[in-house]
Amino acid sequence: MAWWRQGYIKKIFDEVGNKIGGISFAILGIAAYDFKKLGFNETYMHTTPSQALEMGKSLKANKVIGSHFLTFVLSLEKVLDPPKLFKENAEKYGYKKDDAVIFKIGEVKNLKELTN
């Protein structure tokens, strides 16, 4: 698959992380990734929860915020899996569970809450 049709290109995210030297938080998509039964072997322009956590590490983000889930059913993963997997896998990628943030529907937080 062409590089531009993938959600995560490690080389690019590593380069950005190295160039800027880290960020407070990254907002990254965590859903609409399971297209295997449709004939695609890769995530096709979206990222898995694990890829989002890896992207956060590449960007040297202190916290990662999972986004782009529970909106539309665009692929074949179970609708509630992405936020669950995102939190469950946080520690594998060097994040504390509290540093992998999932907002509830309608939840609002200010930047001070996110950066503490």
Identify the function of each model-found stretch:
Residues 1-6:
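Conserved beta-strand hairpin/beta-sheet module of binuclear metal-dependent hydrolase folds
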Residues 8-103:
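Cap/insert and terminal regions of metallo-dependent hydrolase folds
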Residues 98-116:
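C-terminal regions of proteins
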